[in-house]
Amino acid sequence: KYAGGNNAGVEYLDPKQEDFLVFINNDTIVSSDFLNHLINPFLSDPNCIITVPKILYAMDINKIWYAGGLINMWTGTIDHIGIRNYDAPRYSFLMETDYATGCCLCINTSDFKKLNYFDTNFNMYCEDVDLSIRAKKMNRKIVYSPKSIILHSVSQSLGENSFIKIKNKLTGQMKLFWKHASGLQI
């Protein structure tokens, strides 16, 4: 389980409060300078709480998998910006985004602890969106840093359209909206 495993890893490592944590999937390939570009937004904006890279498909490095994210509590949708589109200049600007994908995100240890880690009630899927919503409720920014680039071999663990993946995704989304949507939005 993503949430519990990452939480246990942080507890085991016991990093210093000022250290940065990078949570990254095992089916990714990073560029040589991705970490510098992932840290830079923290250095220039004290309201930055989480950063995320531009994520391209490993099988087609010209196509976007993630260039930021959008959450709509009214429609119950969680969308990656740019998904399956060819990379273009419009995906190359530093910007605030609604959520950070757990495929790769960076956060300061003290902030991760203030957020009380990943919520382990999410088995797989939406624990990253939940963390992002809680971060935004602290009036902090999640920043998409497009100069930080990684490649993602999508769904290598579960299969892109497997029943298990779809079931886990829907279960995570239901838990997420039940936890965060207002009575009018449900």
Q: Where do the language-model regions lie?
A:
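A short, conserved beta-strand element in the Rossmann-like catalytic core
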Residues: K1, T28-V30, L56, N123, ...
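Glycine-rich, basic loop-to-helix element that forms the pyrophosphate-binding segment
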Residues: K1-P15
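Short beta-strand-to-loop acidic/aromatic patch adjacent to the donor-nucleotide binding site
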Residues: Q17-I29
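Short glycine/serine/threonine-enriched helix-capping/active-site loop
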Residues: F23, I50-K54, I81, S145-P146, ...
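Conserved donor NDP-sugar-binding/catalytic core segment of glycosyltransferases
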Residues: T28-Y66, L70-M73
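Short, flexible, basic/aromatic active-site loop/helix in glycosyltransferases
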Residues: N72-D98
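A short, conserved alpha-helix in the catalytic core of glycosyltransferases
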Residues: D98-I149
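Active-site-adjacent helix/loop segment of glycosyltransferases
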Residues: K136-I186
